Curated annotation (Swiss-Prot):
Name assigned to this protein: ATP synthase subunit alpha
Main location: membrane
Domain of life: Bacteria
Catalyzed reactions per annotation: ATP + H2O + 4 H(+)(in) = ADP + phosphate + 5 H(+)(out)
Keyword flag NADP: no
Topology of this chain in the membrane: Peripheral membrane protein
Similarity-based family: Belongs to the ATPase alpha/beta chains family.
Amino acid sequence: MDIRAAEISAILKDQIKNFGNEAEVSEVGQVLSVGDGIARVYGLDNVQAGEMVEFPGGIRGMALNLEADNVGVVIFGSDRSIKEGDTVKRTGAIVDVPVGPELLGRVVDALGNPIDGKGPINAAKRSRVDVKAPGIIPRKSVHEPMSTGLKAIDALIPVGRGQRELVIGDRQTGKTAIILDTILNQKAIHDNGPDGDKLYCVYVAIGQKRSTVAQFVKVLEERGALQYSIIVAATASDPAPMQYLAPFAGCAMGEYFRDNGKHALIGYDDLSKQAVAYRQMSLLLRRPPGREAYPGDVFYLHSRLLERAAKLSDEMGAGSLTALPVIETQGNDVSAFIPTNVISITDGQIFLETDLFYQGIRPAVNVGLSVSRVGSAAQIKAMKQVAGSIKGELAQYREMAAFAQFGSDLDASTQRLLNRGARLTELLKQPQFSPLKTEEQVAVIFAGVNGYLDKIPVAQVGKFEQGFLSYLRSEGKAILDTIRTEKAISDDTKGKLKGALDNFAKSFS
């Protein structure tokens, strides 16, 4: 066999010369123990808090506990395939998600991966999930209305762009329905409103049944509202770290619009389940428990999330992010730990009651306990003009109604107050999926506070409202247009409205 030494040495020299340093250098550690979605890892000495790490098989995790001899990592996904002694790699990146208009119309998980089967999302930008909220200087006070389309809310507890308004109540009181109607109400503006008024919606489902989320998406799709919405879903079967992360991921997606001079709305449904997921993680990471076994920083968990909803100043592009966090109470107990925390963080709350819901008052808003700490700054002048007196009248009505149960002989003024109150309560009822434009709400409430309903039987109030609205849409379109453009009721408009009401009242029987 002929061995050509010169040829072999030439080949070897060539290989040595062209040797590429292809070895991957990354800091690695070993899994010491794993279980319940938590891994204890030894050896990741320089890992950062909140950094993404990678387990074999592409499973991701996030370093939360940095201790002297090990790192506590929460696992995003199943921990079944991870075993003791496995190698864990640092990625060097803090947890981030894709953001931007490419996500509109999509359903994603807490890490921004699509779960709707419509193919990959090619987002140009990524953003960290946990960033610092805007300071005091970049902010501006809330002054533009964020219309929900619900009379009871827009008239009595108005929400402004950049506000955080808590929706709180027991299970099955219509909390999700309020968020859904608010999202559907933005369709009219998206279809033919100016770009500056458009409100992009993010809905974060935390710990809900998959069937419920699918139903929500289906309604949005059928009504053409999915095109301006992003759904972030961490369902009940997802691991606790995903449920903990989902609100932060959704918030980062909403902040993209806020920071680019646009307006966004985010609904967290619901933060009670996020707190439960966080409690589970904290206890498994051996952090000391506090009240109701929640960790000491559960207040900070919610405050740092909700402080990111803000109205930015004109220098910063005048964008806004409005938050509608949801909290589920147990037996109408608003004084539990998480409800009191979130009430103290937010700028007001919409309190929903089981009793009202079963009485057929829907949305089941308790007007006495609900407040908006922004108030009439978040209403157009026309709404202030008509809704100014309604809250006082309803408060008086509730007080009188409690007394009226005992006495039968009531004087005329009390009787009048009770009649008016019953009709106003009836007027504020609204079926689901039928949000009203602001100018239509103004016209309807105008009829209520000016005594046009006083002679109509309570049972006929809804029929009167429907009839009057269809009459206005056909005969009095000019009146509605004037209210929409002028955003106020001038004496001239008032006269026309009264004329339209008189005409309609004659024909209504």
